[in-house]
């Protein structure tokens, strides 16, 4: 259990928070500290963060209208059915289960936050499989480990002061992440929960 939480928070820190590196001699300015830190939300607390525009199935799971760019079709499916292909598109299916679980929480937060803040570029859709719009999507790459990661985190999202945070993540930080305004050309005010995160001691990019 401790190992699982450690991996989760390492992934969370590397995926969500960022600030620019400082260079030059002399004393370095203190790195900005976050005003708040997103926490895991599940059950009733997570349900309260689901965008009102989304309908729910008989089990209370949010439903999405997803546009598949390959088949050029619009399909209605639950968030939980949408996530496995997203994980397969973003991570290798043989990664440690705890890493996949962390990514599942990030991906679930990402799609719900997207729906609450944006409109899909495809008519009638809440989100699409277009990587230019949202997350990678690879239905053919889904395996048992990925399905288990989604199942074990069912309904869990990140909660930042009663709101869904921007669940940004990356494949490799290069040793130090950048804050949203610098790394993503983010035009709004810097989110209160972003901060500088250095890479792990062994911060090598995994083989594709």
Language model features: what each stretch is:
Residues 1-208:
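Conserved, single-site charged/polar hotspot
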